[in-house]
């Protein structure tokens, strides 16, 4: 939860002093924390009962001060930080213990795929001469495929990508009912380890698990997902430390309302903060993010005619995704702009994009690539999508494709003009 001013002003000031000290100590942004507790008390000496800094003389006698127990996001440790009543001195009593459940996850395996410069890629239906030429024009370095666990065709996808000079990202997502099968997490981890061993450059662990079309209804649970992520991460790194492990990207949504949770879906920000609280940051190289509902330039952070909900805008979507993951980069595993041009009217659920032109799609994708690269906060941007031709009354995915009806690809030119 966000730590906000729900206590008296002096206690809040003292908390900010303690939080600032701890932020510097562990080199983490503590705007959001998993939990914090406080108490105003009399302590037995001038160091408030903590070990004093070297060279400081401790004076015995009752001394008033504040004790704060703070657990950062993604960190099982609960830190005991104390502040004198006059707010002038901070004393560090070390770690007060770990949060319940903090020891249930395995220690993360070593890996070297985190960090790196910004790169561009595209999600393809088929890797053929047409898509290869389009992606090369766009200066894409990655190709993405989404597969089911156990799919033997994945090894052919890896070989084809390598043969054509691309890195490959495999998004591995099962069915909701798979989650309930005993031993499935171990099976999943074994399969993604095989993919890593076969040369997969990146693996996204599941997809949109905040929706019941991807996770069982009534059982959406970020902590349970982190159990899967931890098993997958360690299995992948044991086979190929260089494989980029990306957490599954939740679907951007605010449909669950102020509480953020229903049996069928959770708001993405609530889901991701609880992922962070469950320790997800230890088991990912990159935070998976989707952004696919924009109808204005990604350079804008206001002015959407629908409303100002954060998922409408590129910048606020990025901030929302990384709020609980200080020091981590984002990987946009789906970033696209929907245009009906060349297809006709969009189905009702997508009518919000009816006025987006192909020229705007091309311009905005290039702008998003520039913003991502310049931010330093984005490792990878996968365009959704390159070549899907399907356009139905329920899913107009062809409208997201950068290869348009007739074969032209205006976005290939705009992306190629901004990518090195």
Language-model features: where?
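N-terminal low-complexity, Pro/Thr/Ser-rich intrinsically disordered segments
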Residues: 1-22, 97-119
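Short, non-transmembrane alpha-helical segments in secretory-pathway proteins
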Residues: 4-48
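Exposed beta-strand-loop-beta-strand "reactive/processing" segments of non-cytosolic proteins
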Residues: 30-83
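A short, surface-exposed interaction/processing loop segment used at functional sites
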Residues: 76-102
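Boundary/entry segment of secreted carbohydrate-active catalytic domains
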Residues: 103-150
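Structural recognition of the beta-strand scaffold that forms the well-ordered cores
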Residues: 119-124, 141-147, 167-173, 201-206, ...
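Noncatalytic carbohydrate-binding groove/subsite architecture in carbohydrate-active enzymes
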Residues: 155, 159, 163-166, 170-176, ...
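Structural recognition of alpha->loop->beta junctions
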Residues: 191-205, 269-287, 372-378
